């Protein structure tokens, strides 16, 4: 399924580190869509693009992703704190508070 996405996104996903951190998805207009945390950024972000999704809301999110930004942190706990702060600050369309897509 990863091959169905633009080369820019495939390259970005393949270059992600195997470290804890926070990832942010943006649409083509630069608006924030989603903020999430991961203990392994590469595995977590890749999972969105390599499996079938059971909700139409999640499928819609994935179709809108144009850019992926990440912030590497030292621990999963740091990722959780940063994720919560970024959600409050950026108010992404697909994740408010701890509620998932």
Model-derived segments and their meaning:
Residues 1-98:
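Acidic, glycine-enriched active-site microenvironments
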């Amino acid at each position: 399924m990863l091959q169905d996405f633009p080369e820019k996104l495939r390259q970005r996903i393949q270059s992600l580190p195997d470290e804890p951190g926070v990832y942010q998805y943006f649409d083509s207009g630069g608006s924030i869509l989603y903020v999430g945390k991961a203990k392994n950024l590469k595995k977590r972000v890749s999972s969105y693009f390599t499996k079938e999704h059971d909700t139409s809301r999640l499928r819609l999110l994935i179709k809108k992703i144009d850019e992926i930004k990440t912030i590497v942190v030292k621990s999963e706990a740091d990722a959780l704190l940063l994720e919560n702060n970024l959600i409050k600050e950026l108010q992404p369309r697909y994740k408010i508070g701890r509620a998932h897509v």
